[in-house]
Amino acid sequence: MKTRIHVVQGDITKLAVDVIVNAANPSLMGGGGVDGAIHRAAGPALLDACLKVRQQQGDCPTGHAVITLAGDLPAKAVVHTVGPVWRGGEQNEDQLLQDAYLNSLRLVAANSYTSVAFPAISTGVYGYPRAAAAEIAVKTVSEFITRHALPEQVYFVCYDEENAHLYERLLTQQGDE
């Protein structure tokens, strides 16, 4: 797994990967944080694609994921997943966050994409504690890629240095980097 999981500090919208994962809200209509940044960088085509998904299925439930085109992003597709709002850890948040990562990975693999970039899902306005969220992310992705050929490359894209070090430390502890 050493060559399959990477930590990058920077702007997820600039990454030339097959799939960028968006930490979306249930409406898929964009919002703040990484969701807003992805929608702004992708342009109106992404919003149009999200509107079509909403017309077909309504809101995207927490823990679920949908895939759309990427608009003006360098990626080929965007997987929109809805992570849980942190409510103290007693509302099944851990399982819902794991599901958000797993369902995203399943869509990437099912569509034969080889590379994917994840933000730190639910750690912004949704308030999930960063360390706990990173542990779930690293564990879930590591377990998935040991059992599946795709995606070949997974990137954890961290906005700041502190979060990047957190992911690097967790990957080192697991022997993945």
From Swiss-Prot:
Catalytic site positions: 35 (proton acceptor)
Phenotypic consequence of residue 35 to A: 41-fold decrease in catalytic efficiency. Loss of activity
Role this protein plays: Deacetylates O-acetyl-ADP ribose to yield ADP-ribose and free acetate. Down-regulates ribonuclease 3 (RNase III) activity. Acts by interacting directly with the region of the ribonuclease that is required for dimerization/activation. Overexpression inhibits biofilm formation via an RNase III-independent pathway. This inhibition is RpoS-dependent. Overexpression also results in increased susceptibility to apramycin.
Subunit structure as annotated in this protein's UniProt entry: Homodimer. Interacts with RNase III. Interaction with the ribonuclease decreases homodimer formation.
Enzyme class: hydrolase
GO MF term list: endoribonuclease inhibitor activity; enzyme binding; O-acetyl-ADP-ribose deacetylase activity; purine nucleoside binding
Family named by the database record: Belongs to the MacroD-type family. YmdB subfamily.
Effect of residue 124 to E: Abolishes enzyme activity
A Pfam family reported for this protein in Swiss-Prot or TrEMBL: Macro
Documented effect of changing residue 126 to A: Loss of activity
UniProt-listed HAMAP family: YmdB (MF_01205)
Species: Escherichia coli (strain K12)
Domain of life: Bacteria
Catalytic activity: 3''-O-acetyl-ADP-D-ribose + H2O = ADP-D-ribose + acetate + H(+); 2''-O-acetyl-ADP-D-ribose + H2O = ADP-D-ribose + acetate + H(+)
Binding site for substrate: 11-12, 25, 33-35, 122-126
Protein name per its UniProtKB record: O-acetyl-ADP-ribose deacetylase
One of the protein's GO biological processes: purine nucleoside metabolic process
UniProt keyword annotations, A-Z: Hydrolase, Stress response
Induction or repression: Expression is induced by both entry into stationary phase, via RpoS, and cold-shock stress.
Mutagenesis or variant effect for residue 25 to A: 5-fold decrease in catalytic efficiency. Loss of activity
Domain Macro: residue ranges: 1-175
PROSITE patterns in alphabetical order: MACRO
